[in-house]
Amino acid sequence: MTNIRKSHPLFKIINDSLIDLPAPSNISSWWNFGSLLGICLAIQILTGLFLAMHYTSDTTTAFQSVTHICRDVNYGWILRYLHANGASMFFICLFLHVGRGLYYGSYMYKETWNVGVILLFAVMATAFMGYVLPWGQMSFWGATVITNLLSAIPYIGTKLVEWIWGGFSVDKATLTRFFAFHFLLPFIISALVLVHLLFLHETGSNNPTGVPSDSDMIPFHPYYTIKDMLGALVMILALLMLVLFSPDLLGDPDNYIPANPLNTPAHSKPEWYFLFAYAILRSIPNKLGGVLALVLSILILILMPLLHTSKQRSMMFRPLSPCMFWLLVADLLTLAWIGGQPVEHPCIIIGHFASILYFLLILVLMPIMSIVDNHLLKW
């Protein structure tokens, strides 16, 4: 009799994806982040579902409902902080996952990579709308500032902003629709994750060397299931440490002040994971130019397969390309730091240089360095 795992229509899909899946024998811990992102998504959907049972998306009661969750609901405080800090953990894993893809040339699987970029946009949109829901000062002014950027679009900009707001300012209609979309998007993200995996399993996984590993494959279970469980354990431990010891470390104190349209915060800034893009936006004096730079800072990832000039897929054996990669990492950290600083000297000029360097590295310096590597290795 055939094993039910291999014959049942549903179990067969799970078996081919998680158990008998042939995987390269040499993939490192950098390949753990896909499964960690899946766990993060599950945590966010579960905690979000329970929070939605107690939250009210009305401007008069939203802030109070979050207070009620933290004070009166059984374990409401841990649900709220798991959800808020779970988003931070989600983005840490996302950035590391994308960074691994850039370093090891995983972007050469174009379909998987493009779906991944769409996923990144969807997660960023979800996180932005989630930040608006507690209806604190940063929530309100963040929503006002970011949605207002769309008014830079010629001809239709102002109408588009008013249509998104559902009125002439950020108000009850805006909060209600943001809650609706914040609830819906994670399920769309889950569907996109399945598409992402579908494309990945069409080609098989990349490996650190960038060399095809068809001749040296091992079953996913037990080798990589155990490895993923260890990664999950470390991540969940880090998340619980953050939630239980310093839950407000990555938040903004201004968001504990109820939203007040008549009082602007001294320094409006988004959550830490948007700071690099916010710094690029702020560094361009023109509003439309800033919005375009903001979108392009993420959309530029789509161009990675076209900008690949090396004869090697991975950066593992290239002498100079890794230097450019780590310069890009340092530049992104600089942008994130600048995004959180007030708009004054010397932060303005550092922001300008870091923004120019970001686009210069991806579009010019990294492709040139790959060509130099080809010559150095006499390829």
From Swiss-Prot:
Bilayer topology reads: Multi-pass membrane protein
Q: Where does heme b b566 bind?
A: 97, 196
Q: Where in the cell is it found?
A: Mitochondrion inner membrane
The record lists heme b b562 as bound by 83, 182
**Primary location recorded for the protein, binned into one broad class:** mitochondrion
**Binding annotation for a ubiquinone:** 201
Instruction: Tell me which InterPro entries the record gives.
Output: Cyt_b/b6_C (IPR005798), Cyt_b/b6_C_sf (IPR036150), Cyt_b/b6_N (IPR005797), Cytb/b6-like_sf (IPR027387), Cytochrome_b (IPR030689), Cytochrome_b_C_euk/bac (IPR048260), Cytochrome_b_N_euk/bac (IPR048259), Di-haem_cyt_TM (IPR016174)
Show the stretches that span the lipid bilayer: 33-53, 77-98, 113-133, 178-198, 226-246, 288-308, 320-340, 347-367
Job description of the protein: Component of the ubiquinol-cytochrome c reductase complex (complex III or cytochrome b-c1 complex) that is part of the mitochondrial respiratory chain. The b-c1 complex mediates electron transfer from ubiquinol to cytochrome c. Contributes to the generation of a proton gradient across the mitochondrial membrane that is then used for ATP synthesis.
Q: What protein is this chain from?
A: Cytochrome b
Origin organism is Pteropus vampyrus (Large flying fox)
What is the gene called?
A: MT-CYB
